[in-house]
Amino acid sequence: MSNTIETESMDEMFKDPAPVIANPESVIVELQRGLLNPATGQWQTTAEVRELNGKDEEFLASLEGNKNITYAMYVGTIVSRATVRIGDTLIKNNKSVIDELITGDRDTLLVAILRATYGPERTFKYPCEACKTSNDVTINIEEDFPIQTTTFNLREPFDVTLKKGEVLKFKLPVGSDNIAMSKGESIAQQSTLLISRCVVWKDHKDSLYSEEWAKNLGLQDRNTILSAILGPKVGPKLGEVNTQCATCSADIVINVDWVSLLLA
């Protein structure tokens, strides 16, 4: 019996400790427009995001073969999975509220998710077109994506004056508008969808005919409206990354997007 006890004691000594699963890294960020809490009528602007993990990667990979998933929907899914809260709204139980954010706020969350996942810098490989050598390219997440701000009121409908002097109110597009627009089969159809969703009618009945109304607008009025609703630039500026090849010194220009930055 004593031998059994000794053996059990030795087994206990050499057992590997149970792995400790660390809490995911989180980042706090301020949004410019934020999310309206319908219960309080207050705008919530403080958001918390976490790093992307293997579960997120597997889920997102499962969407890649789905032809019905647009880029806007895919990016929205990334944000809804990695955003913990906006104000006191927990996103895990209210994922659809991400579609109520303007594009600039959504992109601000994406930069925060990038920082939570990779730290202050993101390094990835990119081939040189001149010599075909693979280069390690490092992006400084804070410096390379400067946050644009505006004095424009991002929360209230605004006036747009049409060609014949008619004044109509419009709102800024949010995620759900961008998702609906992305399903248009042409740029013209996408413009129609966006205009029809952003016009603010005094009478709710008029909204039933918004798409047909948008189709019947003259091109000058359509362009005026699109310039107005897409005009305010807020959030991180996503553009080109310029570097040089470490082997042949040729200039390398990289057009980055959020999906490749986060998952490539």
Regions flagged by a language model, labelled:
Residues 2-264:
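Short, surface-exposed, charged amphipathic helix/loop patches that serve as local interaction elements
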